[in-house]
């Protein structure tokens, strides 16, 4: 006999149950409505992708790729297993081992891959897409942070000709950035999320903008690295490693012991080239035109290598140290890095888990949604009428509970109360024979008579 075992969800994952899923549905449906009003369409992406996609897009030296991704070899399919001339079993094994896939840790790279694969550069530009779904990172689980977590995000991608003069598109790029930020702030407002704070910054660019001048970030990074070397012994292990791999990431440290050191480091805002400074000034002007309140945070950087110029982060109160609910920025050049045509891009990702938590902390979670109508039928001759009534009410949009077997009157009302029903439709043989049905309002105990053809109107009154 097999050993009895109680299975549980893996650490860092959890089940989402009613009534909490009612809130999740509202958060996601609100995104569809708000993003749709800005002209965005939904894209649905694979859960796993080639590991190389994330290594190239996110950066091979980032924590996400080097330590946090769930990666595994892709087994050869039946065609690969067929003998191919002198191909040996060892070669097949090596081929399988060299093809590695990863559960997606983020979705921007996947959206860019889809943009290239489906020739979206030939569509009317820009292409506006949004997505939602689970992501996966092997992180230490804590409040608001899981190994399987959920994101809602949006991307704006625009293919352009290689000879475009970047100095002439600065205003347009800034307007797109501002509209994307306006959209996500409108989304949080529609949700009723409280204590929302928008921080913005510009991090210049590490590669020439499409049709633009050489990078302005390199000189700053070198200066930052030199300053970090002077205080290296006072930094934690992760920050010491980042001095060599990506010095900008040190500015993103959340360690309390490092904050004073970070405050004394050079600021990238003091090293922007003329074009990046002009772009940043125009982003701020556009936000002000749209009535979007913001705070400049000159230490703000993003944790992914592909970002340039505009970066932003949105926080919400009541979440402690894990209070960021959204992050995003501009990433011109990422599509080209992945093999596509020169393309500009900006996007963001919302941490849905943290948004849900923030709403719950503010008392805006979903209460259990009961049934609208409980049908208490008594007597075999009433069953057909009860089934017809349930069908008609459901088609009219009511949540209906029809018990599979008849119940005594008192038990039926007790069950209706447990399910949170608003009304009990009482169908006995007398009601069916007379054509007048009894409807009991459970909140106050009042009841009335109604004919079948008037039932829906009576309940909607």
Predicted stretch roles:
Residues 1-461:
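TRNA-recognition modules of translation machinery and tRNA-sensing kinases, especially anticodon-binding
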């Amino acid at each position: 006999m097999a050993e009895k075992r109680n299975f549980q969800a893996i650490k860092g994952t959890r089940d989402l149950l009613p009534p909490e899923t009612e809130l999740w549905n509202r958060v996601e449906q609100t995104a569809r409505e708000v993003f749709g009003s800005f002209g965005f369409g939904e894209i649905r992406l694979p859960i796993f992708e080639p590991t190389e996609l994330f290594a190239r897009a996110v950066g091979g030296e980032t924590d996400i790729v080097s330590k946090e991704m769930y990666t595994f070899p892709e087994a050869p399919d039946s065609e690969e297993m067929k003998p191919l001339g002198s191909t040996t079993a060892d070669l097949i094994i090596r081929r399988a081992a060299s093809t590695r896939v990863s559960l997606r840790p983020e979705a921007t790279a996947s959206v860019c891959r889809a943009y290239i694969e489906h020739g979206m550069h030939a569509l009317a530009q820009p292409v506006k897409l949004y997505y939602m779904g689970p992501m996966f990172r092997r992180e230490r689980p804590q409040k608001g942070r899981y190994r399987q977590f959920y994101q809602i995000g949006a991307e704006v991608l625009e293919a352009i000709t290689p000879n475009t003069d970047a100095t002439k598109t600065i205003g347009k790029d800034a307007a797109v950035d501002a509209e994307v930020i306006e959209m996500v702030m409108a989304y949080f407002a529609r949700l009723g999320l409280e204590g929302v704070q928008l921080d913005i910054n510009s991090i210049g660019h590490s590669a020439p903008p499409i049709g633009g001048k050489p990078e302005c970030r390199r000189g700053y990074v070198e200066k930052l690295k030199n300053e970090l070397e002077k205080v290296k012994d006072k930094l934690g292990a992760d920050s010491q490693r980042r001095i060599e791999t990506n010095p900008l990431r040190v500015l993103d440290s959340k360690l309390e012991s490092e904050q004073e050191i970070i405050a004394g480091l050079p600021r990238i805002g003091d090293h922007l080239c003329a074009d990046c400074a002009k772009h940043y000034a125009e982003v701020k002007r556009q936000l002000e035109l749209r009535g979007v309140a913001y705070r400049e945070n000159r230490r703000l950087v993003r944790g992914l290598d592909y970002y340039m110029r505009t970066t932003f982060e949105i926080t919400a109160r009541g979440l402690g140290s894990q209070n960021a609910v959204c992050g995003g920025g501009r990433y011109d050049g990422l599509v080209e890095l992945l093999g596509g045509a020169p393309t500009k891009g900006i996007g963001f990702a919302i941490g849905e888990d943290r948004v849900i938590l923030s709403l719950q902390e503010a008392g805006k979670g979903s209460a259990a949604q009961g049934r609208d109508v409980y049908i208490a039928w008594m007597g075999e001759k009433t069953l057909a009428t009860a089934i017809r009534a349930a069908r008609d009410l459901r088609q009219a949009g009511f949540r209906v509970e029809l018990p599979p077997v008849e119940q005594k009157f008192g038990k039926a009302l007790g069950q209706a109360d447990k399910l949170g029903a608003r009304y009990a439709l009482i169908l006995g043989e007398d009601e069916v024979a007379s054509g007048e049905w009894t409807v009991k309002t459970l909140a106050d105990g009042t009841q009335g008579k109604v004919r079948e053809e008037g039932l829906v109107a009576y309940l909607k009154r």
